[in-house]
């Protein structure tokens, strides 16, 4: 497969056939948001319901179209976590065989600066610090929405997208100036 003049190698694609699954992709960039659509939803004729941060509603397209579809835009501040968890679980209701749900377990794009900021805020949390030390290119999962999705799962398969190569496109400017592909 070729996209943005990049070549992709996909292993195990046969396992994606059948009823739509729950998607949990790594989130390292703006560009990697298209991976589930291009390599999963479109080829298999599936629709995904998305859990997205409410800050994206500043984009009029996402505000208008995203709210007309069964997606959820969550407040990540933690002010109303229980409501957000209920909203994520509700995405599972009424799923057809060709509909799945996508959540980014990390809750944000990975960057070294975000990782180090989290380390500073949680310096007294030994378990989290150990996790940060083990997973050098991941943010720890934010468990509220992910667990709500899993708890309300009626038996759908889980698909994890553990991709690499998009780290250089964590900001919109990287996409425009070609810096993420070494231009």
Could you describe each region identified by the protein language model?
Residues 14-16, 56, 77, 164:
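Short, solvent-exposed coil/turn elements at secondary-structure transition points
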Residues 42, 46, 54-71, 96-183:
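A cross-family acyltransferase "interaction/gating" segment
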Residues 81-93:
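A Trp-anchored, charged/polar loop motif used as the substrate-binding/catalytic surface
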Residues 1-2, 21-81:
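Catalytic core of membrane glycerolipid acyltransferases/transacylases, capturing the structured
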Residues 20-21, 156:
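Conserved acidic residues
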Residues 1-20:
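N-terminal signal-anchor transmembrane helix
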Residues 7-11, 36-38, 88-90, 145-147:
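A generic local structural motif
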């Amino acid at each position: 497969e070729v996209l943005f003049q990049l070549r992709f190698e996909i292993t195990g694609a046969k396992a994606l056939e059948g009823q739509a699954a729950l998607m949990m992709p790594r989130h390292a960039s703006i560009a990697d948001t298209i991976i589930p659509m291009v390599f999963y939803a479109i080829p298999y004729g599936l629709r995904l319901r998305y859990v997205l941060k409410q800050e994206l509603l500043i984009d009029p397209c996402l505000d208008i179209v995203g709210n007309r579809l069964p997606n959820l835009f969550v407040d990540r501040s933690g002010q109303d976590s229980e409501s957000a968890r209920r909203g994520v679980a509700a995405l599972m209701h009424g799923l057809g065989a060709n509909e799945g749900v996508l959540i980014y377990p990390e809750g944000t794009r990975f960057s070294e600066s975000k990782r180090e900021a989290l380390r500073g805020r949680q310096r007294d949390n030994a378990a989290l610090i150990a996790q940060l030390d083990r997973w050098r290119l991941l943010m720890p999962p934010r468990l509220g929405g992910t667990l709500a999705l899993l708890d309300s799962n009626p038996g759908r398969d889980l698909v994890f997208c553990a991709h690499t190569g998009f780290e250089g496109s964590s900001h919109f400017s990287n996409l425009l100036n070609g810096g993420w592909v070494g231009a």
